[in-house]
Amino acid sequence: MRFSAFLTLLLVAFVASCSTFASAESVAEGRRLRADAAPVPVNKDNVAKLAGGFLEKLKTNTALTKAANTIKNSNADEAAVRKAITTFAAAKESAKMSDEGIAKISAMMAGTVQKNPKSWPRLRKFAKVTLGATVAGFAIYGAYKALFDRKSSTAATTTTTTGSA
């Protein structure tokens, strides 16, 4: 498949999935929202627990990646494999968030919300757009590398024989 055909298919899929943007003007409530609508309540404790869980998972995944790379590069050295496993276990134990850490995150978030409560929807939207752009960039880069990388292409070698077999 040629790269231009891939880009065309990607563009068509993007336009098809974004059809709601084209019809957003026809929605009656889309433009005239009531100013006295109640804001969505934010459970600060739940947000802090989610943030703590995210940080814990991030640290664990980083430690797992390092351990896996160490094991791959150890060339079946049993001592290196054991050391990588024990290092990962220690990192996983240290990554667990304590109640004090969650309380610090909760206090920090509460202070930020009290300073500017209207910034959360904009920050959330910015995070989603940034994540979407990053994922799309990685998808395009991966497709480009898969199509044009010389090491990954397994071109069939053609052999010709002369005469009869």
UniProtKB/Swiss-Prot annotation:
It is a single-pass membrane protein. Keywords: Host endoplasmic reticulum, Host membrane, Host mitochondrion, Membrane, Secreted, Signal, Transmembrane, Transmembrane helix, Virulence. Induction: Expression is induced during host plant infection. The chain crosses the membrane at residues 129-149. Residues 1-24 form the signal peptide. GO terms for cellular component: extracellular region; host cell endoplasmic reticulum membrane; host cell mitochondrial membrane; membrane. A motif (RxLR-dEER) lies at residues 31-57. The keyword Transferase does not apply. The keyword Membrane applies. It is found in: Secreted; Host mitochondrion membrane; Host endoplasmic reticulum membrane. Effector that enhances P.infestans colonization of Nicotiana benthamiana leaves. The RxLR-dEER motif acts to carry the protein into the host cell cytoplasm through binding to cell surface phosphatidylinositol-3-phosphate. Belongs to the RxLR effector family. This is RxLR effector protein PITG_09218. It comes from Phytophthora infestans (strain T30-4).
